[in-house]
Amino acid sequence: MKSYFILNCLNQQKIADSLYRYYIELTAHKKIKNFWNNLDREEIKNYFSIQNLELKKWFDQMELRVRDMSFTIYNEEIQTNIHTDAPPVIAKINFPVLNTQDTYNVWYDSAGKEIDRVECIKPIVLRSDIPHTVEIGSRAKFPRIQFSFCFYKDPINLLM
């Protein structure tokens, strides 16, 4: 099974802009302290109730129904380490929103040796059940914002 699969998204910028607006709304009155930030059911419902939402249309085209939604923040104060996501999720979709150029998803084998990497400039299906992290290049800007989506049916078929 592949570590990732780059997805074609004709409306990537429009979707990224919509996610960024929602991120601003979600974080307007709270300080973010963690890399990983889960949205609750009400927040997910509110986002997907937006009229003519391009992200919903895109997921509908792939026959994917969102179960969980979160965002990640990477900046001077908030980073992440090599980790494996909690079961039962094997595959999820990461969607780049802001400052993802020169940032990379990197995967490792059980011995800690790098086995794969991809720059985070396009939406990807990523394998989250093996050790992985985010690495930042010297030209990266902060804050780096990316949204992550889990589904009722994992898009594992795209990693085969």
Please place each PLM-identified region on the residue numbering.
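Non-heme Fe(II)/2-oxoglutarate
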Residues: M1-R65, S70
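Short hydrophobic/aromatic beta-strand or adjacent loop that forms the aromatic wall/cage
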Residues: K2, I90-K92, R144-Q146
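Short beta-strand-to-loop capping motifs
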Residues: L7-N11, V97, F149-K153
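Short linear sequence elements within intrinsically disordered, low-complexity coil regions
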Residues: C9-L10, A28, Q79, K113, ...
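Residues that cap or initiate secondary-structure elements
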Residues: N11-Q13, E77-I78, P88, Q101, ...
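Catalytic core of non-heme Fe(II) oxygenases with the double-stranded beta-helix
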Residues: L64-I130
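Catalytic core of Fe(II)/2-oxoglutarate
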Residues: V106-M160
